[in-house]
């Protein structure tokens, strides 16, 4: 039988070996954890740098894609000139319509009547005068003129004296008669006569 002294020696030896192995194990575990923590930091930092690099790479690629799409659009328009011609025609038509609308707004709503009286040379036998009346209506853009031959009964003795004077001027009775005649003429008859003349 072994003595108890030898048993205690084996027990102490076994405990010392166990403590040494536990210490080595803890040291190995701590070093492994430290290694993993350092690697994790490196991996995290690398992932950040990679994400930043990818973003920086994507920005110029997007710019290239945009420039490429613009080039394709321009080249399509260059090869198909019809689209450009249609756009130019639409712009011209829109500008023309706008100019017409502005012009029609600037014009007065009522027609202006210009009365021009030109006495012609009178002969001793006929004793007649011609009065030319030109009427212009701006809103409808149709211009027409009418010439009226007035007989001697239009003029009174005073108007004949004034007509033979060196400075011819229109008297009040003449103007009244002209305006009374114009009031009898309807604008519809004038426009119909102008349309018949143009046709």
Curated annotation (Swiss-Prot):
Cell compartment(s), UniProt: Membrane
InterPro entries: DUF4718
Bilayer topology term: Single-pass membrane protein
Protein name per Swiss-Prot or TrEMBL: Uncharacterized protein C1orf185
GO cellular component: membrane
Keyword annotations of the record: Membrane, Transmembrane, Transmembrane helix
Positions of transmembrane segments: 17-37
Record Pfam families: DUF4718 (PF15842)
């Amino acid at each position: 039988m072994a003595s108890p002294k030898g048993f205690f020696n084996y027990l102490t030896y076994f405990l010392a070996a166990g403590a040494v192995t536990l210490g080595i194990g803890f040291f190995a575990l701590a070093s492994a954890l430290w290694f993993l923590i350092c690697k994790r930091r490196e991996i995290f930092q690398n992932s950040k740098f990679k994400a930043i690099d990818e973003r920086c790479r994507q920005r110029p690629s997007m710019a290239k894609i945009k420039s490429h799409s613009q080039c394709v659009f321009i080249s399509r328009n260059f090869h198909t000139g019809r689209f450009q011609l249609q756009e130019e025609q639409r712009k011209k038509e829109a500008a023309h319509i706008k100019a017409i609308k502005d012009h029609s707004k600037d014009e007065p709503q009522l027609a202006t009547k210009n009365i021009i009286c030109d006495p012609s040379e009178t002969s001793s036998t006929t004793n007649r005068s011609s009065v030319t009346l030109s009427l212009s209506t701006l809103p409808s853009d149709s211009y027409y003129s009418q010439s009226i031959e007035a007989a001697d009964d239009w003029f009174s003795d005073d108007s004949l004296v004034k007509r033979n004077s060196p400075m011819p001027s229109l008297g009040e009775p003449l103007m009244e008669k002209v305006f009374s005649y114009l009031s009898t003429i309807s604008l519809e008859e004038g426009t119909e006569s102008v349309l018949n003349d143009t046709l």
